[in-house]
């Protein structure tokens, strides 16, 4: 929801006016598709990097606006949490050394953020969910004081008319009620974009759904939330519930939440995907719309489809369809939203290359996959990967196969082939896809965190264990060493200043029920 100037829809007239603009934008998109106005080539890639801002004790630091002012770069923008920022990277054509260029670009931006953070007594950290987060960090006081976030929070709360109920069961179980959408800011991601030829968009979108589970399994990096060991990629469960506009008592009566993996294959056009979203999810906010999109096309101009873009920004499919205009030319993209931030920039670029390689390397045998595979198998794969990461058994071509075997024997060769077809430098392909391959025999981010958390918890309180893990993540990110090369934390690595200890580091939070007649 990138538009800063938004207001809550207040009455029937405003709703009707907004729906009119939405319908006009949908008609305009149909006209552009029929007139062959959508750009087909070159194919470009892009990304958005979200990150946490932490203090010297590795707890969230509520000073994003001060750091943003110090950075003073239009590539950076705010998030709903005042301890998060986002970088919008420049798109690059999919060719030769685009991935290493993207890594260099991202490292340069992060260095800029790091310098600004240091001036504000802060650090920046890449991780899917910050291990040191606690409930006190996700109050409205820590929401970025910008109107659009307050408007969105109020609109979602009004549509629910009750508090948010979060219930996630993994190794541990988390169940809580919360009064705002700030739970959503426990998550940060590395959102990757791939431009898609409009002639093959639906087939490409269905393929992006088919590969989502295996890709997520190797990328998982978010196993802890509030000291609880939950899913390998807990962001999937948390985000789904944290912005759910459905009331708790009516969850069984609605097919899907605003955060979804969808329920079926897509079989028509991208306009129908948008149209389904519009019909399924009511509009929450509005903005100013100066021009009529259909009229613009008739006058030979390209519209930005602002109303449609605003609505799309409040519907959070894990693979989201996107329309954009670059250099005066309209294009279509798929935005991959399920890949977490971190563990390092090198890991993130490897994740992106793996996904892009699979997207452009799809063998002909997987064309029209909606006619061959059961969508429920694909959806099961995705949520199994979110729960179990590299321990997932996938249903692939109607048979069960381990994540490791599927990635090594079929998907990595497929990704190499796709990348070579687009002229990606073999050196770059080898560099980044080897990072993926090495994780199979060692750890992804989630596995590394859990192994250390369990070991540290034998001698430390959970808050101290989380703090130690976060400090080590920060140190290793500074060197940009891929996660597969990270050793487990040793006693020699632990160097947390005692001034950063709190009562909770030594206090037990277990509750025991004792009656007066019980012997102690």
Task: Please report, for each region that a protein language model flagged, where it lies by residue.
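Phosphate/nucleotide-binding catalytic core
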Residues: 1-520
């Amino acid at each position: 929801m990138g538009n800063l100037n938004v207001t809550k829809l207040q009455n029937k007239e405003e709703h009707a006016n907004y729906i009119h603009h939405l319908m006009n934008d949908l008609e305009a998109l149909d006209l552009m598709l029929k007139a062959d106005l959508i750009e087909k080539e070159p194919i470009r890639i892009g990304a958005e990097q979200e990150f946490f801002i932490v203090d010297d004790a590795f707890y969230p630091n509520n000073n994003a606006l001060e750091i943003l002012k110090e950075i003073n770069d239009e590539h950076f923008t705010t998030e709903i949490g005042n301890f998060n920022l986002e970088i919008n990277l420049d798109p690059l054509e999919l060719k030769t050394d685009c991935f290493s260029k993207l890594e260099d670009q991202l490292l340069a931006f992060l260095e800029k953020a790091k310098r600004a953070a240091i001036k504000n007594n802060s650090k920046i950290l890449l991780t899917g969910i910050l291990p040191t987060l606690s409930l006190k960090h996700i109050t409205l006081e820590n929401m970025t004081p910008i109107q659009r976030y307050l408007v969105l929070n109020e609109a979602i709360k009004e549509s629910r008319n009750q508090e948010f109920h979060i219930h996630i069961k993994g190794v541990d179980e988390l169940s809580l009620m919360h009064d705002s959408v700030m739970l959503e800011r426990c998550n940060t991601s590395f959102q990757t974009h791939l431009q898609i030829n409009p002639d093959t968009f639906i087939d490409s979108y269905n393929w992006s759904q088919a590969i989502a589970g295996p890709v997520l399994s190797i990328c998982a990096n978010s196993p802890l939330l509030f000291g609880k060991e939950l899913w390998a990629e807990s962001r999937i469960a948390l985000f789904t519930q944290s912005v759910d506009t459905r009331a708790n008592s009516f969850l069984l009566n609605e097919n899907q939440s605003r955060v979804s993996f969808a329920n079926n294959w897509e079989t028509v056009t991208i306009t129908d995907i948008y149209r389904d979203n519009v019909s399924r999810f009511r509009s929450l906010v509005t903005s100013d719309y100066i021009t009529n999109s259909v009229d613009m096309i008739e006058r030979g101009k390209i519209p930005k489809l602002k109303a449609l873009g605003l609505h799309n920004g409040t519907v959070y499919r894990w693979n989201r369809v996107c329309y954009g205009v670059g250099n005066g030319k309209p294009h279509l993209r798929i935005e991959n939203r399920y890949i977490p931030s971190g563990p390092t920039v090198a890991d993130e670029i490897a994740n992106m290359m793996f996904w892009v390689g699979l997207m452009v390397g799809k063998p002909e045998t997987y064309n029209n996959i909606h006619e061959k595979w059961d969508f429920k198998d694909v959806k099961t794969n995705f949520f199994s990967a979110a729960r179990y990461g590299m321990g997932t058994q996938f249903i692939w071509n109607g048979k069960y196969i381990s994540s490791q075997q599927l990635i090594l024997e079929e998907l990595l060769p497929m990704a190499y082939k796709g990348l070579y077809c687009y002229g990606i430098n073999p050196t770059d392909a080898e560099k980044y896809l080897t990072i993926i391959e090495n994780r199979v025999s060692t750890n992804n981010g989630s596995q590394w965190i859990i192994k250390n958390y369990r070991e540290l918890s034998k001698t430390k309180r959970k808050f101290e264990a989380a703090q130690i893990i976060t400090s080590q993540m920060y140190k290793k990110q500074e060197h940009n060493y891929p996660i597969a090369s990270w050793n487990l934390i040793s006693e020699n690595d632990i160097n947390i200043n005692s001034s950063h200890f709190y009562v909770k580091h030594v206090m037990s939070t277990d509750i025991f029920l004792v009656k007066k007649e019980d012997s102690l």
